[in-house]
Amino acid sequence: MSLTNQNSKSKAAFERALPLMPGGVNSPVRAYKSVGMTPIFAERAQGSRLYDIDGKEYIDYVLSWGPMILGHADPIVTAAIQEQATRGWSYGTPTEIESAMAEVVISRVPSVEVVRMVNSGTEATMAALRLARGYTGKTKILKFEGCYHGHGDSLLIKAGSGVATLGLPDSPGVPAQIASMTLTVPYNDMDAVRIAFEKHGDDIAGVIVEPAAGNMGFVPPQPGFLEGLREITEQHGTLLIFDEVMTGFRVGFNCAQGHFGVTPDITCLGKVIGGGMPVGAYGGRRDIMEQIAPQGPIYQAGTLSGNPLAMAAGLATLTQLKPEHYEEFDRKANRLSEGYLAAAAKYNIPLTTNRAGAMFGVFFTDQPVTNFEQAKSSNLDMFRSYYQKMAARGVFLPPSQFEGLFLSTVHTDDDIEQTLAAVELTFKELQLEFNR
């Protein structure tokens, strides 16, 4: 099958970019190394569709890696950005729209009584760890294998996302002294968590976790896992931090914590809350958040934090989301899962799917995937071929086995059926290619 972008404007654009930026990109997964392709260079996007610079049209399940929950170029969000831009886009002094945005976040996220806006998910998680250490007086952080919390030094230990995509165990440049303050255990493994607390419980400031992991593929929590984390952290005076940068307002109307019924002490947000603009946030209990400067002694600041354009886009996004959207997400994700599994059974393709809300994951393995080691058992050669064939058929997927798919409010039933038709043809070819 011809991959049209391999001898195209995208190829020329990538060759131009290669000497200008590390690997030709500004974020590693965009290099498409793990799928053996030249990157698809976008020209524009509208609704559920993305168009490359050759004019090829794709059904988009990347959605800018999650933020575009209303689809691309939503007219209400577009109008909000344009209206704000006519009045300026950065002032260096407070604006009323920051309070309006904070009110919506606080009303929707069960754990958040006070919120601080920042510029990215990485900033949010870095600030949350500093806050946990400052509040508790403890130093160690417990995280989970395959969970990605941004590129802060102390969180690049056995991380997922692009780190897993490129096959990197950790990152050079992280001092051993910093790495030693991060404890790592398998996701969904409460026995391992208990052992870590038996050894280090008096010194663990925070447990940071994706309440549904989206950076080792999509892996939801097993029954009792989040509840177990809540219980053990309360027993030890440790703060529970939910990294909802990806799951926030995607897994549920009240985020993953509302969907699963477990309330952390601190929540990190990003992606959807900016409507596609650079943004992050962290919030939590009032007594914890009051420790942040200028109210308290724990310092964190940002020139562009609470940027009016980002606040306008985020507010216009969140106010359009309704509980019934999540019922539709569940229905469409269920149809995708059924269709994928039916095609896999028909053509003897090893496949497991996971889903929750507007997130969906596919693994080329017969075994259930509940942690990072199981995710890594997926057949990467098969994924690479699947990715290339689906792209050629006009379906834009995350170019990594270790990333999940995203749905938007504007993905139609016809989009889903077109996608499953492409899956059917692709799996038929995979059966022949891999002698299934």
From Swiss-Prot:
CDD domains, A to Z: OAT_like (cd00610)
Compartments, record wording: Cytoplasm
Signal peptide: none
Family matches, as InterPro entries: 4pyrrol_synth_GluAld_NH2Trfase, Aminotrans_3, Aminotrans_3_PPA_site, PyrdxlP-dep_Trfase, PyrdxlP-dep_Trfase_major, PyrdxlP-dep_Trfase_small
GO biological process, one term: protoporphyrinogen IX biosynthetic process
Protein name: Glutamate-1-semialdehyde 2,1-aminomutase 2
Similarity-based family: Belongs to the class-III pyridoxal-phosphate-dependent aminotransferase family. HemL subfamily.
Catalytically driven reaction(s): (S)-4-amino-5-oxopentanoate = 5-aminolevulinate
Subunit architecture: Homodimer.
Provenance organism: Exiguobacterium sibiricum (strain DSM 17290 / CCUG 55495 / CIP 109462 / JCM 13490 / 255-15)
SUPFAM superfamilies assigned to the protein according to its UniProt record, in alphabetical order: PLP-dependent transferases
Keyword annotations from UniProtKB, A to Z: Cytoplasm, Isomerase, Porphyrin biosynthesis, Pyridoxal phosphate
Cofactor(s) recorded in Swiss-Prot or TrEMBL: pyridoxal 5'-phosphate
